[in-house]
Amino acid sequence: SWRAMEELYENGKIRAIGVCNFLPDRLIDLCRNASIPPMVNQVEMHPLCQQKEALDVMRECGVQPQAWAPFAEGMRGIFKNKLLCAIGQKYGKTAAQVMLRWNVQRGVAVIPTGNASKKTPVSGISFLMNRIWKPLRTWTKDTA
């Protein structure tokens, strides 16, 4: 239970507590009723699943968003998405690197794991902390 995790945190047994896949209404409820709010909420988040409302709520609650599927699990042809590929080509990056950058630029921590990341190297991601890329600033689901 959440209370047990709060106790572990308060006793120094764990360094952080968080949740996974909490919808905005559930996260708001937990944040209002918990002694210690969650520090992170892991959700599927990538250009085709943007989670705008959830991201807004996480920011309001002071919860760090974390994308557990920043590559859409390699599904829906995401690595061949025309816009992602065009942006990547402009900056000399792969579609995978563009997807990581998109999340990081929005303040989202990323976990590039699983089969999709094994098939798609993401080395050389130091570009993640460079200036904001204008093409990604206004990315919406409608442009994907």
Label each PLM-derived region with a short phrase.
Residues 1-144:
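Beta/alpha (TIM)-barrel catalytic core signal, keyed to glycine-rich beta->alpha loops juxtaposed to Asp/Glu
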